[in-house]
Regions:
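C-terminal edge and immediately downstream basic/flexible tail or linker adjoining helix-turn-helix-like DNA-binding
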Residues: 91-98, 106, 110, 132-135, ...
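Amphipathic, Lys/Arg- and hydrophobic-enriched alpha-helical face
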Residues: 22-40, 57, 137, 182, ...
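Short, charged helix-capping/linker segments at alpha-helix termini
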Residues: 11-20, 30-49, 169
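Structural recognition of an alpha-helix C-terminal capping motif at a helix-to-coil junction
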Residues: 45-52, 65-77
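Arg/Lys-rich amphipathic alpha helix in sigma70-family domain 2
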Residues: 59-63, 73-94, 126, 178, ...
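Helix-turn-helix DNA-binding module
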Residues: 41, 131-171, 185
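Sigma70-family region 2
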Residues: 11-12, 35-38, 51-66, 85-87
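N-terminal module of bacterial RNA polymerase sigma factors
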Residues: 1-28, 113, 121, 138, ...
Length: 204
């Protein structure tokens, strides 16, 4: 069943159809929330909040873009807002803010490394790369992190990213260019976009 058909069913009162939409996309939405906010537990809460908010607003959803794009817009906006608010709460001084960011990045990298150890399909080199990317993502600014997650990990095209972030297409391209440079400098100049995509979901 196509997403549009499920959306129409929900609008007609068949709320169980929304459960199918959640099952289809909750893992990828969670992954994006986690990459952006940097906290596993917060990402779970943000994922639930995103699907709840989308459900409550479904009556106003015009379907000019797909549900998949729309739910990501909701989730990314919530994650970025959460991160900004979290940083404001934590930042007592510039030094304290920098320390908090570093701690958050290290924690995300550790969690990713632990998960990689449990994955028999991922070798030690790839596991370390996976963890390095996770940590480096948290050291990027919010705009750069979001566009890297959406393009190089989740695989959205430029037009979809423009709709999700609600920015011009040209801004997506220039922001992604700068974000990739920043990420490569934070990890290793040899890292490629294909490696980032594999880290995201294991497929091209």
């Amino acid at each position: 069943v196509e997403d549009d058909a499920l959306v129409e069913r929900v609008k007609q009162g068949q709320t169980e159809a929304y459960g199918e939409l959640v099952r289809r996309y909750q893992d990828r939405v969670f992954n994006a929330c986690w990459r952006i906010c940097g906290h596993l537990e917060d990402a779970r809460d943000l994922t639930q909040e995103a699907f709840l908010k989308a459900f409550e607003g479904l009556g106003n959803f015009r379907q000019q873009s797909g549900f998949y794009t729309w739910i990501f817009r909701v989730a990314v906006n919530l994650s970025l807002s959460h991160r900004r608010n979290d940083h404001r709460r934590r930042r007592v001084s510039l030094d304290a803010g920098a320390a908090a960011t570093g701690t958050q990045a290290d924690e995300l990298a550790r969690r990713v490394r632990d998960e990689s150890d449990d994955d028999p399909t991922r070798g030690p080199v790839e596991a370390e790369l996976h963890a390095a990317v996770a940590g480096a993502l948290q050291r990027l600014d919010d705009d750069h992190r979001a566009v890297i997650v959406l393009r190089d990990i989740e695989g959205f095209d430029y037009q979809e990213i423009a709709r999700i972030l609600q920015i011009p297409l040209g801004t997506v391209k220039s922001r992604l260019f700068r974000a990739r440079i920043a990420l490569q400098q934070a990890i290793d100049p040899a890292i490629t976009r294909e490696e980032l995509k594999r880290i995201g979901d294991g497929e091209d």
